A protein has these predicted regions:
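Short, surface-exposed loop or secondary-structure junction motifs
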Residues: 65, 119-346
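Short, gly/Ser/Thr-rich active-site loops of penicillin-recognizing serine hydrolases
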Residues: 311-313, 322-325, 369-398
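Short, conserved catalytic-motif segment at the N-terminal edge
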Residues: 24-78, 175-181, 252-256
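Short, well-ordered beta-strand elements
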Residues: 353-358, 362-372
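Bacterial Sec-dependent N-terminal signal peptides
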Residues: 1-25
Length: 398
């Protein structure tokens, strides 16, 4: 007589087998990061993989502060540096999605003060140009670097709107027609510009009639369920924050104080990999959060479209399709570089490096946050291997 196995038992055994396989896979990638982050001279990091549009794995390794024994966990905040910009742009794109602005509107139609390139005073600057770094505005690094609150640390005492006005208007304390503006007209050349995103922060405030932080908390973070994301140190209700570390070749990592700067919408967000995953999930799931539409599908399509192919062939709205190659600086052999271009963003600030990217078609994404800098070729190669491992983990769920 043939013996039969009940269907319920088969389902139970299959479910158990799948769960064990997933657990084993997660153990493998966890072991990889545990064994390799120190080899790359990384002090502390958070990583995450998104598969099939959902967060499938995250890990935290190393220390918040070198040699402190205070370990990074999944709730530890990391400084985003320029990976802040996609979050800032969400605020602008939400207003666009609601019909409160058009991307090709002149920004001066919304500002209480006027911003124009003195070399082309009649040429309008638009939201699209600011989002794509084609506005003809420039970073004056002498001014920009001098306003970091290092070495003492803390939030900047200089208010955003005042700073931006003094930077872009004639007669302002930080105004320089030679250093703050390009010789090319708006929309005619590409040059990455942090101050353009500070200006977007001011525009968001003036359109919404709220502070940047208040608007982002209520209109972006709350609906996206980002409960551990902050713009200012003074807002953070805990001390679970990764300290930034500058690499000093002879003496070893130098621990920096938590710092800030007045152009904070361009880089000062502190958040976790789990919170930032909500942003990538929004892009991957075409504007939906938990099956609820947060941005229209056509808004996401606009977001991810190359905007100025003749002068910036990889640049979408905020996202760049060549970010990984740019991030790795091409210092490793070509075989280590991705051939397929994906939307992403990288971030660098004193003592901090961040990288996020995603594949809208395969519904995968990865996140890496560091509280130290990678300067050695060996470290860059390990970093690239980490990216590949995270994508591999993401694809298992897709």
């Amino acid at each position: 007589m043939k013996k039969t196995i009940p269907v319920t038992l088969l389902i139970t055994l299959l479910s158990y087998s799948i769960a064990c396989t997933a657990q084993t896979d997660h153990q493998k990638i966890d072991k990889y990061f545990t064994n390799h982050y120190e080899k790359a001279k990384i002090i502390g990091l958070q990583v995450a993989s998104i598969g099939d549009g959902e967060l499938v794995w995250q890990g935290s390794y190393g220390e918040k502060e070198n040699l402190s024994g205070d370990m990074v966990n999944d709730s530890t905040l990391f400084l985003m540096a320029s990976c802040t910009k996609p979050v800032t742009s969400l605020g602008i794109m939400k207003l666009y999605d609601q019909g409160r602005l058009d991307l090709d509107d002149a920004i001066n139609d919304y500002l209480s003060f006027e911003v124009s390139n003195p070399n082309f005073p009649e040429e309008k600057i638009t939201f699209r140009m600011l989002l794509c770094h084609t506005s003809s505005l420039r970073d004056n690094w002498e001014v920009y670097d001098s306003l970091y609150t290092l070495p003492e640390g803390g939030d900047s005492p200089l208010e955003l709107q005042l700073y931006v006005k003094e930077y872009f208007t004639e007669g302002g304390e930080f105004y320089s027609p030679e250093d703050n503006f390009a010789k090319e007209a708006p929309g005619m050349s590409y040059s990455y510009c942090n101050m353009g995103y500070a200006l977007l922060g001011v525009l968001l405030e003036q359109i919404s009639d709220r502070s940047f932080s208040e608007y982002m908390q209520k209109e972006i973070f709350k609906p996206l369920d980002m409960k551990n994301s902050y713009w200012f140190l003074k807002e953070i209700p805990h001390k679970n924050i990764a300290r930034p570390h500058e690499v000093v070749p002879v003496t070893g990592p130098h621990v920096l104080n938590h710092y800030g700067y007045p152009s904070f919408p361009d880089g000062q967000l502190r958040t976790t990999a789990a919170d930032y995953a909500q942003v990538l999930k929004l892009m991957i799931n075409r504007g939906k959060v938990n099956e609820t539409t947060f941005l229209k599908e056509e808004t996401i399509e606009e977001y991810l479209e190359i905007q100025y192919p003749d002068i910036a062939k990889y640049q979408a709205l905020t996202w760049n399709y060549n970010e990984l190659d740019a991030f790795l600086y091409k210092v490793v052999a070509p075989r280590y570089l991705f051939m397929r271009k994906l939307p992403g963003h990288s971030g660098y600030d004193p003592g901090a490096e961040t990288f996020v990217t995603f594949d809208p078609k395969k519904k995968t994404g990865i996140i890496i946050f560091l509280n130290s800098e990678i300067i050695q070729i060996k470290g860059v190669r390990i970093y690239h291997q980490m990216i590949k491992k995270l994508f591999k983990e993401a694809k298992k769920a897709s």
